[in-house]
From Swiss-Prot:
Residue ranges constituting the GAF domain according to the UniProt record: 269-413
Protein's name in the database: Ethylene receptor 3
GO BP field: negative regulation of ethylene-activated signaling pathway
Listed GO CC annotations: endoplasmic reticulum membrane
Keywords: ATP-binding, Coiled coil, Copper, Endoplasmic reticulum, Ethylene signaling pathway, Kinase, Membrane, Metal-binding, Nucleotide-binding, Receptor, Transferase, Transmembrane, Transmembrane helix, Two-component regulatory system
Membrane topology: Multi-pass membrane protein
Domain of life: Eukaryota
Gene, per the UniProt record: ETR3
Note on cofactor: Binds 1 copper ion per dimer.
Domain Response regulatory: 718-834
GO MF entries: ATP binding; ethylene binding; ethylene receptor activity; metal ion binding; phosphorelay sensor kinase activity
Functional note: Ethylene receptor related to bacterial two-component regulators. Acts as a negative regulator of ethylene signaling. May delay the transition from the vegetative stage to the floral stage by up-regulating GI (GIGANTEA) and RCN1 and cause starch accumulation in stems by down-regulating the alpha-amylase AMY3D.
SMART domains with a match to the protein in the record: GAF, HisKA, REC
Amino acid sequence: MLLSTWTPGCFQGNKILLRSLITWYYLEFMPKLRPFYFLFYLTLPSCATDSPPISDKSSSIFLPLAQQQQLVHWMMPPRFRCQDYLLPLLLALSPAAAAAREVEYHHCHCDGGGGGGGGGLWSMDSIFRRQKVSDLLIAAAYFSIPLEILYFVAGLRHLLPFRWVLVQFGAFIVLCGLTHLLTAFTYEPHPFMVVLLLTTAKFLTALVSFLTAITLLTLIPQLLRVKVRESLLWLKARELDREVVLMKRQEEASWHVRMLTHEIRKSLDRHTVLYTTLIELSLVLGLTNCAVWMPAAGEMCLTHELRRDGGGEDGVVGVDDADVVEVRGSDGVKLLGPDSVLAAASGGKEEGTGAVAAIRMPMLKVSDFKGGTPEVIQTSYAVLVLVPPAGKSWGRHEMEIVEVVAGQVAVALSHATLLEESRAMRDRLAEQNRELLQARRDALMANEARQAFQGVMSQGMRRPIHSILGLVSMVQEEALAPEQRLVVDTMARTATVVSTLVNDVMEMSADSRERFPLETRPFHLHAMIRDAACVARCLCDFRGFGFAVHVENALPDLVVGDERRIFHVLLHMVGNLIGRTEPGHVTLRVRAADDDVLDDRLGQRWDPRWPSYSTGYSSVKFVIGVKRQQNGDAGSPLSRRPSGKGIDLRLSFSMCRKLVQMMQGNIWAINDPQGLPESMTLVLRFQLQSPLTSSSLGGSFEQKHSSPSCQIAGLKVLLIDDDDDINLVVARKLLEKLGCVVSSPPSGSGFLSSVGSSAAAFQLVMVNLEMKRVKALDVATRISQYRSGRWPIVMAMASDQKAWEKCAQSGINGILKKPVILQELKDELARILQST
């Protein structure tokens, strides 16, 4: 019913009204678009030609002319308002165009035929046909645009945020095409349904157009940002182009630097390096001349130049020159002025030359490359002067090339200096190597001499002394008179001291240092004093001295200490006193010292740190003094003055002091007015030994009347030693003295065959670890492999303490230290038999 009330004139008026409303909305909310909608408003009546002709007038829809003029004046920007005379003309044309559209076509006499009855080119029928074809083509074009958009835009994911805009735009285009398609059916008589569809299509087109315009409010700022971003990207591209140009220049400069560095480092001669630098720089930078000025004795001397005709007369510039001071005080390239003396001396004042540049080159020292704390060395600088041709200016890249090349030249010169120093060092090392080889040969010869000395000492002194000690120990077991026993015990103790001294000498020759090992064990102090007094009496009688000994009765007897070292020190004290003075009388006093603090002749205080006698320790004081005769018989054969030097005695006294200090004691001497020793005092602190353990005393030379153990008697012993001298005989006699049955192979090399032939014949094997032709440790190892059960027991004889540790790893049951003494042999055999 509503549709039936719509007439063509009413429909045309509503369309114009709708467009007016849309125009008002955009002009109200978007003032910047007023000029464009003004033009749209002027062309609005002419766009109505696609509507069918209507019979009634609809000019009442438009505003009056005055109001239309005001509306256009409001819509026009201020810059267009100056031309107000155009507004009446434009407003007059707009109603005329609308009126021409609203009248029926058969009242139009446009083709001159009137009524549209003519058949010319511009007849109404021809115009309608052309409009119909145009509408169909426009519709086809509109319909093809969405297809093209779908074909080209469907796969672009970055346009997904704009898909709603694309949908609206596509709908707008489709509806516009549909409007033109329906309009093509209105040029001929058509039913009302076509008009209704056309109206609906136009309404939807207007609605979609309105929505699309609203959507563009949010899209246009984004497009503007894209434009701004495009501008920024364009600026960034220009900056990148400039950076690429700079990078190319830097790459070119780097290539030149690498080439120059390669040429400079080809040689390690300083003159070749400098001349190569001058030549290559002149080729790369196109220089006229290059010069190198070296410091020498407060002046700068021209040492290297590309061409010699450009230098000064003498080629010398003072180091206090302003340009020289400025160049040497800066790191970069400095341009010299036109009045520079340095530039003139380098050929910079000639015709055809440009601005002269100069740079310093540090002359690095060899000590700069050595490790450790660097030395404070004043850096020396050379000056490189560059003379370009006329018209050439120094750019930043050229200056960078010069700076890098100057650094490379400094490094190359330092390498050349280092090479020269290394060559000199190589020569010195070669000389030192020759000296070391000579020292090595001398050391080998000294080692051979030392080994020969040790061999002579071992064969000529130690082995005979060991034999003497063994024989003396056998004599001690015999029934002797008291005087005889005193002499024998003294001989045994003296031989023990000599053996200890020989061992000390051999150890010092092997280790090249003084070593005095102590062997602390229980001993009888009274017997040791008695033997020392006996030897001292013999020495005094030989030198024409009288001798007396006084021993305190309260002196302890069983003490713990190293009796050999104490005996040695006492003999040294006696020898030192009687060796430097005229004949007189020697007195030996031995007493228990008090616990108070004792002072020596040097004022040094020695405070015993051990407990008193009642707590198990006792201090013993030995004082040996000499009283010279006023009128000695110089012609007596017993009065002989030794010819020893005082320095030797002082050295010997120093060694004795060291021994005493190792035993936690002290020793000092008192001299007379002539500087000769008058008395010597020795203070020692001993640990007391309980009488219950007197049976464990070792090394005592008193007579033992106990008979051999029943286990030792009849023991079958195999004695292995490749030496056929007196030592083997003494060892055999000692074992036979204890009641053992002793056998020995012909040599050490035949030992294994003896063991294989009579495996159960021996109960004990004694091996000498100091055999020459056979390694005793290998023999002991083979014995431990062949034996089974409790056979045989292995015991080794050695004088070297280092060999004792190896014996425990080789399966040796016991160690007997040389010299072999009867009582020690008996005690060791008893211990081994008891433990196994």
